[in-house]
């Protein structure tokens, strides 16, 4: 099966536009409010800079502002963003599965390499890697798979609940790369089953068991981990 390359009708976007589209796509996917101030925080640039960038992207037919002053990707913008994200996630899989890099390093290197990779190399890597469905931390590769409709944030689970981790939010990956290393080191990775031992609504913490260890997470951290609840045995 060939990955969808239908967005390649025009020229490749610049690295700056790619960064904007990637960030907007991640926030949209995580159902975060898509406002320019939030985008500026994500990208680490000033609000006036984002305003200029969004005006250019609107002119180029990539984004639009809705009635709530939120950013929306147009059909063209979505196709372009999906292409960028797809290439990034395939590169991450190659860097982790093929070269043995850790999550954080792989993400940083993929961001550097993705702009220099052709469609031919991208497709070949995808095939060589066995047509992976997700990035190393579980986020679906656009055009090939989708997140489970049953998944919930770990922070919403109560004591006694069991779940299978599906993915770590891209928001965590981009805004708190050390969080990726923290979760990886504690085996809170896709495919792992966990049991909630304690949900402290006052202290805003979640104590979970994963394999033979116990891990305490803040609600903020737990909200960046997605999982599918499983029936109690």
Tell what function each PLM region has.
Residues 69-88:
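Basic, amphipathic "hinge/linker" alpha-helix immediately C-terminal to the N-terminal HTH DNA-binding motif
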């Amino acid at each position: 099966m060939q990955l969808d390359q239908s967005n390649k009708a025009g020229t490749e976007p610049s690295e700056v536009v790619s960064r904007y589209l990637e960030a907007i796509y991640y926030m949209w996917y995580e159902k975060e409010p898509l406002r320019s101030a939030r985008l500026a925080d994500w990208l680490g640039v000033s609000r006036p800079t984002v305003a200029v960038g969004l005006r250019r992207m609107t002119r180029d037919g990539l984004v639009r502002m809705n009635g709530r002053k939120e950013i929306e990707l147009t059909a063209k913008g979505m196709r372009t963003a999906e292409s960028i994200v797809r290439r990034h996630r395939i590169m991450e899989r190659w860097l982790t599965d093929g070269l043995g890099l850790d999550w954080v390093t792989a993400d940083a290197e993929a961001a550097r390499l993705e702009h220099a990779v052709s469609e031919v190399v991208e497709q070949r890597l995808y095939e060589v890697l066995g047509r992976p469905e997700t990035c190393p931390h579980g986020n679906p590769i656009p055009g090939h798979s989708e997140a489970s409709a049953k998944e919930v944030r770990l922070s919403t689970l109560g004591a006694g609940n069991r779940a299978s981790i599906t993915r770590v939010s891209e928001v965590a990956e981009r805004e708190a790369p050390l969080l990726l290393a923290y979760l990886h080191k504690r085996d809170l990775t896709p495919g792992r089953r966990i049991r909630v031992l304690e949900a402290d609504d006052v202290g805003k913490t979640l104590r979970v068991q994963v394999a033979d260890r116990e891990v305490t997470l803040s609600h903020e951290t737990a909200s960046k981990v997605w999982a599918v609840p499983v029936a109690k045995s």
